[in-house]
Amino acid sequence: MDERIVKFLKKMHLASVCAIDDEGQPYAFSAFYAFDEVNFCLLLASSDDSSHVKFLKNSKFVAGTVALDTKIVGKIEGVQFQGVMREANASEREIYFKRFFYAKVMDPKIWSISLEKLKFTSNVLGFGKKIKWERSDKI
């Protein structure tokens, strides 16, 4: 993955993610995330009772965005991604709690979105500059 994408995803903390609901329709949710830069995963906390986690029975495939909140056109940056969501393993949980240490007291379930394909748009690199990435070892 391009180092500029890694730097951006490490800097940010809020993702908008879309799952598929029981009627086959898109269902969007937002979540704080930690980025696993070794395995290229977004790690987030969510309850088994949440709608989006329940919808994983329909499809583990998700899509989403991470975007810088700015009104300055020259600073616009963001990622559009597709991935596969599953329960996080122990090392991924450690990464999440290293970033959001205060969440550990609530002992939330941590989920991992394995990034499979993404497009990074950055006006910082040049107006409308896009960098695409795709995982070579597809799930």
Set out the residue ranges of the language-model regions.
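Short, catalytically relevant binding-site loops at active-site mouths
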Residues: 34, 49-51, 70-72, 117
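Charged, gly/pro-rich active-site loop segments
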Residues: 73-139
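A generic structural signal for nonpolar/aromatic side chains embedded in well-ordered alpha-helices
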Residues: 9, 55-56, 96
